[in-house]
Amino acid sequence: MPAARLAIMADDTNYGSLGALAPNWSDGERNIDTDEIYKRFFEWVADVKGVEPWPHQEEAIMDLLAGDHVILNTPTGSGKSLVALGMHFAALCTGRRSYYTAPIKALVSEKFFDLVEVFGRENVGMITGDTHINADAPIICCTAEILANQALREGRHADVGCVAMDEFHYYGDSERGWAWQVPLLTLPNTQFLLMSATLGNVDAIADKLEDMTDTDVDIIADAPRPVPLTYEYTLDPLEKTVELAFGRGETPIYVVHFSQDAALETANALASTGVSSKEQRAAIAEAIKGTKFTTAFGKILQRLLRTGVGIHHAGMLPRYRRLVEQLAQQGLLPVICGTDTLGVGINVPIHSVVLTALTKFDGTKMRKLRAREFHQIAGRAGRMGFDTEGLVIAEGPEFEIENAKALAKAGNDPKKLKKVKRKKAPEGFVTWNENTFDKLIDATPETLVPHMKVTHSMVLNEVEQGGDARYRIDRLIDDSAQTPEQKERLHDRADEIFQTLFDTNVIETEDRDDGGKDYFMTVDMPDDFALDQPLSPFLLAALELLDLESENYALDVISMVEATLEDPKQVLRAQERQARDAAMIRMKEDGLDYDERMDRLQEITYPKPLEDMLQAAFDEYRHDVPWANDYWLSPKSVIRDMVETASDFTGYIARYNIARSEGTLLRYLSDAYRALARTVPLEKRNEQLRDIISWLRVVVRSIDSSLVDEWENAGAGTDASEAAANLAAPGAKQAVVEDRRGLTVLVRNAMFRRVQLMDLDKPDELGALDKDWGYGVHEWEDALDDFYDEHEYVNTDAKARSGELFILDDSKENSEHSWKVRQIIDDSDGDHDWAITGTVDLDTTQSSGEVVFFDYSVSN
């Protein structure tokens, strides 16, 4: 939890020790000279870090102190972070604001806490779009896009003294590379430290940066790898490869896959092969003793961890990923199966990397790994301070492994060898061999291909700066590293955007005495424009289309919010698959022939509530607000679906069979909660919508509280020190029920979900929900038989779900930490003589995100 971590830091004797060596920023103390900066910094490195810097680190910091730019193209584990620390310290000592940028929020957040630990919380801030902590601090951690937008808004006048750009190979990313190029072109007074282990040839970048800033650029690319690597290509089955490495003591092992499903499949296979010792398993059991594995995937993870096998990928809950990282850092996990997220910022010590393939699906096709991708992954092998070398193993293709197995079985018998039928690569299969592996080992990362774009938001950021925005946009394009053909297209795009902004009266110009033009806006830019929720202004406008008195108002607001959020693709695919399966059954029952079924099936997709109304409104909005053309709506129903079906997190995961994508769903729910809580005005919230927002907070917080804490302690305006103080405040969380409204909705939903399943006559699903408190399948079958002997059907309309039929007794909340609840069933005869009654375990319910009962009954 972020605030907790800050509180712990305050007790660390070395907390803020480097920041204490710098002049006081807020008091305007006198700057110190470079010799003294160098002396203080490296004395701190020796005394506090207890390490001796490598020559390339000293060289880089000396270059930075001399005022030069530095491109640090050195291997993984070669201490790039220490150089960045030196740059931040030098900036703090000379009265300059410094920035650290990274491609993903998780890395920004991690670096923020690292810097707080050494510089002190008053000296470090963080901006990630949805999070603002101490944004006026002398050291700012942010995503690359945040800095790029600031550079466009403020240009040469930006208060950006120096920037450490981590993972600079993103400069070559086709979608996001513009954000790494823009600051180099628009901040001529800023010093840059560009860092990555896989930059390739950077001469063109260095020349461009030197030309734009009239400052020398020093390239440091000859640092030796601290832990050398050895390479091995094998045709052994994966399980045997891991077994052999385990036997040779070459653990921990990270087995790299290029899909989440493949990672889990391997983890399950390895869990049964005995990859850990009895002592390791006992240590793991002790380490995870207090961990709650409450979700479906959590139970899978718990089983795997107890065998010594970890799993790590982006679809997991953040708390599960952190747990795996912590166990690995403690040396408790011999094997981790994961995806190639290993290559970006995962903090896991690894001795051996095993690549299960040398190809990957890039979103459009299968292709061989590029040199940069390979070295990003392979470079993680070898633990500095632990290993004398790291090991990188590549598995051959499955068909080649089968061939090798057959040949080995034949031995040296010529007759048997002759009978061996060699398998061939499947048709269309992109294959690889040992030569592929050797070429990747020897290859240097490809030269980064620059990317640039021009959007409405970029133009408006320039206009907001004042002066001749058109000249600066043209200059940005001309100065960019793009080809002449690309520049021509960018100029054409700029023409279109400026014309649109003029036609819609969003911008105007004034002639200057010197013959130039000043551009200015006729409308106010939203405060969070082009950050995490660029369509928030549209959402506010679209809310006016809804009737606050409508029965579906709250659900329609949710649909509007969902249309502005990023798609949780795995969840939507599962919805579509289930909808198509149900449609196929209906079409078969209706006697449709195969071809017609297939044609109709292609038209079926996941639910998109209010699609026509929203699209029409958005088209009109884009006419009046042209910068919205940079974005698009994506109607969907995840939150709404959960509300309408009274689903909790666990039930929704089970319903769509998406246990492997729990993290994806949770991140989406978290984004939805933030959007609802921050964007929808209080006067636009009716009672049902307030209930839903509270319920959503309870769901997200109970599954993984860090996602809510991070935003509420930071994004809502609380600075880091206040967050830590609030967290530690006596009595801050003494209440048995932290969020009464949200928890009440959670319980009501759980009870009504059972009513819905009664209506559908689903004893199997009801039994699965209630077996732990004495109502398994057989008990529910008996209850349903008795109910339907007396009544024809169950109502599930709004009246059946109303508060009149739900009774909550909280008299034992404080004494026994329980609620007595009763859901009256709205039967066909209106007798209301049947009810589901239970005693809710408040503590377990709030920590698990699903309702847990002490006792339970269904009766009349």
Where in the sequence are the language-model features?
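Conserved P-loop/Walker A NTP-binding site and adjacent catalytic elements of P-loop NTPases
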Residues: 44, 50-228, 234, 252-277
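Helicase-associated low-complexity/disordered flanking segments
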Residues: 1-70, 275-306
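Conserved interdomain hinge at the start of the Helicase C-terminal
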Residues: 232-258, 265-268, 322-331
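Conserved two-lobed SF2 helicase motor
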Residues: 136-152, 307-321, 327-347
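Conserved C-terminal RecA-like helicase domain
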Residues: 99-101, 109, 116-125, 261-335, ...
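Non-catalytic terminal extensions of ATP-dependent helicases
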Residues: 310, 329-330, 413-416, 421-813, ...
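Conserved segment of the helicase C-terminal RecA-like domain
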Residues: 352-355, 359-361, 367-408
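Compact beta-sheet-dominated globular domain cores
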Residues: 826-860
